């Protein structure tokens, strides 16, 4: 499968800036790599935004890993580090809210922020919301597109599974961060 075909509908030959939410994980690295492959054909101004949540012991290594990849590939790199948390109640929501505030503060007019969410994330979100007793209208899936401040969020991989993304990373010999918290059942998303 040609993953870049999923991106092309969102690329305009205009003076837009395209950002990638770069966690360091496989989803965001495959996404950024696909944009790199077509950057010259579309004259893309690429930037990456990395948020260091400051809760994992390896978070500084991940930040540096992302920074180095961007430096080598001439990608403008934004990095923000969140303050250490002492209150862990509702942590996932708090971190998500902080991430989106940062994204919104960086996006400029008409810019696009690509995010690496995929089909497995959509299924996970549906079940998490249903377990929490969300009303029917709240069970809608993760939107492929939505506005955020002056820009727009695009999730081009929502029809792909995690397995397909991992396969693509292997084909392209991509290195990425393996976040062990993804196996930690104390986070609702992993339960």
Task: Describe every region a protein language model picked out.
Residues 1-191:
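Core alpha/beta nucleotide-donor-binding catalytic domains of modification enzymes
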């Amino acid at each position: 499968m040609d993953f870049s075909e999923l991106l092309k509908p969102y690329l305009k030959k205009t003076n837009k800036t395209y950002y990638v939410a770069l966690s360091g994980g496989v989803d965001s690295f495959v996404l950024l790599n696909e944009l790199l492959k077509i950057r010259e054909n579309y004259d893309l101004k690429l930037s990456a935004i990395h948020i260091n949540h400051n809760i994992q012991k390896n978070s500084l290594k991940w930040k540096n890993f992302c920074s180095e990849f961007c430096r080598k590939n001439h990608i403008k790199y934004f990095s923000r580090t969140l303050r250490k948390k002492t209150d862990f109640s509702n942590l996932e929501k708090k971190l998500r809210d902080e991430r989106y505030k940062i994204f919104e503060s960086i996006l400029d007019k008409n810019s696009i922020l690509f995010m690496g969410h995929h089909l497995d994330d959509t299924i996970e979100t549906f079940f998490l919301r249903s377990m929490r007793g969300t009303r029917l209208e709240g069970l809608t899936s993760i939107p492929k597109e939505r506005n955020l401040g002056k820009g727009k969020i695009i999730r081009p991989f929502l029809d792909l599974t995690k397995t397909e993304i991992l396969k693509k990373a292997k084909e392209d010999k991509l290195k990425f961060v393996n976040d062990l918290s993804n196996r930690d059942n104390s986070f609702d998303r992993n339960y």
